[in-house]
């Protein structure tokens, strides 16, 4: 079987653009197919945790991310009035010239990855929904768009989240999902002058809020709510007004024109190989993690970095698929188990609930690159 020279990526989100950048940087021809005509620009933050920043550095966009974001060190855990409870360290994994972690606007990271991928020669086809991906007769793959065009590539990579194309004319294998009755409401607010690092605020009842500075003017906030709860600005102000002083002050910054992004809490991992009919699934098409410890994004980018590393060896498609699973499957399973436990403790705290111990368990898994 011939070496891979042309990669087709389905989806232009974090995983897809990172995969396109990784493959193009490895010297391969890359085409990206995105169903939407305009880039997704969510008004939300992304927590660039240590292992995520390390992989962004490996992709060549680390310096640009630091310039665009807000570096911080350590996650502070406070009560609703702002009193310190404990701290979770953020080790410096990206090298001494980089901070340990940083906050960014989600859309800014999307922009940086897209620009870098295109600079390295990747071609982006927007408004081109893919209806089918399959193995061709000549040991290559075919990507078929809804307009009927058939695009031949050596490797097709699905990175379109839950929006999966068919595989060889059949529905793609479903990923088992545990849907928790919770949601996170995200927004960008004016940054409190005293906010200089990621902060988890534990209020009364089930209310929690993650607050992360994204630049000198703004901070991202994510408020944990019961699923289906109202997420209008008025509803969020009312929710936070019943909490301690710190959460009250954040709620007061939530103006009527503040857009929000609501994300349900889901946990899933694709059973068995992440490939079928010669087509590879990565990112949220293969695993969906709760947002805890920043691993939902980190694991998606890690998929792309591993893919790029393997492509540099010019493997055949089948050899790459086997090597990719050997590098990613067990590691992703272990990380998925840790962050899912954190989400379940949010839902139903136990006597054994120990967030610092869980963070330490995660750190042991991701300290070394995949």
In which residue ranges do the predicted regions lie?
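Conserved mid-domain beta->alpha element of the FAD-binding
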Residues: 9-25, 159, 259-341, 345
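Conserved FAD/dinucleotide-binding core of flavoprotein oxidoreductases
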Residues: 86-90, 94-100, 105-108, 114, ...
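C-terminal auxiliary extensions adjacent to catalytic cores
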Residues: 360-370
């Amino acid at each position: 079987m011939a070496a891979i020279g042309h990669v087709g990526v389905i989806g232009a989100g974090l995983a897809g653009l990172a995969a396109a950048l990784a493959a193009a940087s490895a010297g391969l021809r890359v085409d990206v197919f995105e169903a939407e005509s305009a880039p997704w620009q969510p008004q939300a933050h992304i927590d660039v945790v240590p292992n995520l920043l390390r992989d962004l550095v490996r992709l060549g966009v680390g310096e640009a991310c630091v310039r665009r974001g807000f570096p911080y060190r350590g996650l502070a855990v406070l009560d609703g009035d702002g009193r310190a409870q404990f701290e979770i360290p953020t080790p410096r994994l990206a090298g001494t010239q980089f901070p340990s972690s940083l906050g960014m606007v989600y859309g800014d990271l999307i922009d940086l990855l897209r620009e870098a991928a295109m600079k390295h020669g990747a071609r982006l086809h927007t408004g081109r929904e893919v209806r089918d991906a399959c193995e061709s007769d000549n040991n290559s793959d075919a990507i078929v768009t809804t307009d009927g065009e058939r695009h031949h590539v050596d490797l097709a990579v699905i990175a379109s989240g839950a929006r999966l194309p068919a595989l060889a004319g059949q529905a793609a294998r479903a990923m088992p999902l545990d849907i928790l009755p919770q949601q996170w409401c995200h927004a960008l607010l004016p940054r409190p002058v005293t906010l200089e690092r990621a902060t988890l605020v534990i209020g009364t009842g089930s209310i929690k809020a993650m607050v992360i500075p994204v630049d000198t003017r703004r901070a991202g906030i994510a408020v944990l709510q019961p699923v289906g709860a109202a997420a209008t600005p008025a509803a969020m102000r009312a929710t936070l007004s019943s909490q301690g002083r710190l959460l009250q002050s954040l709620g007061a910054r939530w103006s009527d024109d503040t857009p929000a992004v609501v994300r349900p809490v889901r946990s899933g991992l694709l059973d068995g190989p992440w490939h079928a009919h010669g087509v590879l699934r990565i990112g949220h098409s293969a695993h969906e993690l709760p947002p805890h410890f920043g691993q939902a994004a980190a694991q998606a980018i890690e998929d792309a970095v591993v893919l790029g590393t393997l492509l540099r060896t010019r493997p055949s498609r089948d050899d790459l698929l086997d090597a990719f699973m050997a590098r990613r499957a067990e590691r992703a399973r272990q990380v998925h188990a840790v962050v899912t436990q954190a989400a379940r403790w949010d839902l139903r705290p136990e006597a054994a609930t120990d967030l610092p111990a869980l963070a330490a368990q995660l750190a042991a898994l991701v300290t070394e690159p995949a």
